């Protein structure tokens, strides 16, 4: 597998930021997508140990939500599915405070986070990138998938 270019986005809730996304097959080519085009599908609930009320993150008034999107292109959709399947079982250590969603669209692995605490968001992203690196190296080690 070749080195993948990734598009990153970080916007505050309600911001009209844009997401930069790499186009598969065109190294260095990026498409700009409005950040609101891909909302986080699930509302996140506060941790039971939190001093805040049990209102989902997306419904708390006056709370700033940090969002981060990562788009990782793969040479084939099968490799993207393999990577997604390998990364989905990893449980988020701060489940009630950080939400993570993985999805495959064609050859692109899409990962989205939402959190109130930017430090927990950063920790989750760093852990994910470590795991992603391991998965990509493993795919490279075993070579491209064989079609039956």
UniProtKB/Swiss-Prot annotation:
Transmembrane segments: none annotated. GO terms for biological process: tRNA processing. Disruption phenotype: Mouse embryos display primary microcephaly characterized by significantly shorter cortex lengths, cortex-midbrain midline lengths and cortex widths. Mice do not show a renal phenotype. Residues 1-21 are annotated as: Disordered. Keywords: Cytoplasm, Nucleus, tRNA processing. InterPro entries: CTAG/Pcc1 (IPR015419). It is found in: Cytoplasm; Nucleus. GO terms for cellular component: cytoplasm; EKC/KEOPS complex; nucleus. The keyword Cytoplasm applies. Pfam families: Pcc1. The keyword tRNA processing applies. It comes from the Eukaryota. Belongs to the CTAG/PCC1 family. Component of the EKC/KEOPS complex that is required for the formation of a threonylcarbamoyl group on adenosine at position 37 (t(6)A37) in tRNAs that read codons beginning with adenine. The complex is probably involved in the transfer of the threonylcarbamoyl moiety of threonylcarbamoyl-AMP (TC-AMP) to the N6 group of A37. LAGE3 functions as a dimerization module for the complex. Component of the EKC/KEOPS complex composed of at least GON7, TP53RK, TPRKB, OSGEP and LAGE3; the whole complex dimerizes. This is EKC/KEOPS complex subunit Lage3. It comes from Mus musculus (Mouse). The gene is Lage3.
């Amino acid at each position: 597998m070749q080195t993948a270019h990734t598009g990153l986005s970080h916007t505050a809730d309600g911001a009209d930021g844009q997401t930069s996304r790499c186009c598969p097959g065109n190294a260095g080519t990026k498409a700009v997508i409005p950040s609101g085009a891909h909302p986080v599908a699930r509302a996140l609930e506060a941790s039971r140990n939190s001093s805040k009320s049990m209102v989902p993150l997306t419904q708390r008034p006056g709370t700033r939500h940090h969002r981060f999107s990562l788009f990782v292109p793969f040479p084939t959709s099968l490799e993207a599915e393999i990577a997604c399947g390998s990364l989905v079982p990893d449980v988020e250590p701060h489940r009630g405070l950080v939400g993570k969603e993985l999805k495959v669209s064609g050859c692109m692995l899409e990962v989205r986070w939402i959190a109130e605490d930017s430090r927990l968001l950063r920790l989750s992203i760093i852990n994910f990138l470590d795991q992603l690196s391991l998965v990509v190296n493993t795919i490279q080690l075993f070579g491209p998938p064989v079609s039956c």
